[in-house]
Every structure is written in structure tokens, then in C-alpha cells.
């Protein structure tokens, strides 16, 4: 299944989460597209709730179904809680950490920066958005790319870096210091529903 590249606002409204990170999609019309008001949101079945939760997380991180399922299966082989490990693996993606560091305004923009070769890991260019960053590794902007307007604008708007990352804004360099804890990951996701979905 290919990655969705259509209007994120429509998907955000359908799933009830902000994929842009701004929350603007939900401010004006906080109900699914095609409906004429919030009261018409239909009640979902148990399967529907599980599917919706899976789609929320998949679209949030911008991962296609094949990669999403592969990461889920990998998380199941790790010690600890399956759902929590799954979310930690998604959070450790290079494109996501570029976004978390504030080098991009959205994960989609971060993915483009990685794909176009603007991002280094431990000083080496990595152009694979799904690259899994390990604790202790550094993420930086390539010297020739440091004047890109999209990066400057993103850094100006960014006012929060998670505790599992450190950022040197002058050097445009950050370090993934440790794996995140569940309390530091998206609270609007119920990963237990996703585990149930794939266990059917």
C-alpha cells in the first residue's frame, strides 16, 4: 500500500487528530469531512475503533501499511510491552526526530529534508526517512543546507524539544540521548487497540 500524499486536513478531521502539528484543521470544523455537523459522527464498532486507532498512528508518523506492519512485528520480538515498544520504534525514525528537533515544521517536511540529502547522522549523509536512530547518535543539518529557508522558519517556530533529545541550535545539531518513555509519546494514541487489531 502506498503512502498517503493527499490533503492532510481531510485525514486529520476524519481521524480527529492534527497531522500538521498546528491543530488548525480541527479548530474550524472538528468533525469528519462530508458531515454537516459534529452530532452526526457515527458510533464505531470494536473493530472500527481498532482500525481507526491504527490509522491515526500510521498517518501521524506518515508510514505506509507495509512498513507499519513490519515495525509492529519487530516490536513484538522485543522484551517489554508490545504496543509501547512499537511506538518507541516509530519515534526513533530519522524523519520523526528531525521533526522533533525542530528542523522541520511537519513530519512530511522532515521526510523531504532527509530524502533530499540535507540531514546527517553522526556526520554521514542518510537519505532514508525510516532509518532507525540509536541512542547516542547525533543528527545534524548538512553545512550546505543550513541556510534553507524552511529550516530557518521551522527553528524560529519551534519552542519545545523532548527530554530524550538535546539540541544545539547554533550548530543545527541534536543528539538522541535515550529512548523515550511512554509518558513522552503521543497521549492521544491507545496502542492497546492497535495490538488488538493485529491480533485478530
From Swiss-Prot:
Region (Disordered) residue spans: 22-43
Alphabetical UniProt keywords: Ribonucleoprotein, Ribosomal protein, RNA-binding, rRNA-binding
Record-level GO BP terms: ribosomal small subunit biogenesis; translation
Alphabetized SUPFAM superfamilies for the sequence: Alpha-L RNA-binding motif (SSF55174)
Record-linked InterPro entries: Ribosomal_uS4 (IPR022801), Ribosomal_uS4_bac-type (IPR005709), Ribosomal_uS4_CS (IPR018079), Ribosomal_uS4_N (IPR001912), S4_RNA-bd (IPR002942), S4_RNA-bd_sf (IPR036986)
Assigned GO CC terms: small ribosomal subunit
Pfam families to which the protein is assigned, alphabetical: Ribosomal_S4, S4
Domain S4 RNA-binding: 92-152
TM helices/strands, residue ranges: none
GO molecular function, one term: structural constituent of ribosome
Functional note: One of the primary rRNA binding proteins, it binds directly to 16S rRNA where it nucleates assembly of the body of the 30S subunit.
Family statement: Belongs to the universal ribosomal protein uS4 family.
Stored HAMAP family: Ribosomal_uS4_B
PANTHER family registered for this protein in UniProt: 30S 40S RIBOSOMAL PROTEIN, SMALL RIBOSOMAL SUBUNIT PROTEIN US4M
The protein's assembly and partners: Part of the 30S ribosomal subunit. Contacts protein S5. The interaction surface between S4 and S5 is involved in control of translational fidelity.
Protein's name in the database: Small ribosomal subunit protein uS4
Organism: Geobacillus sp. (strain WCH70)
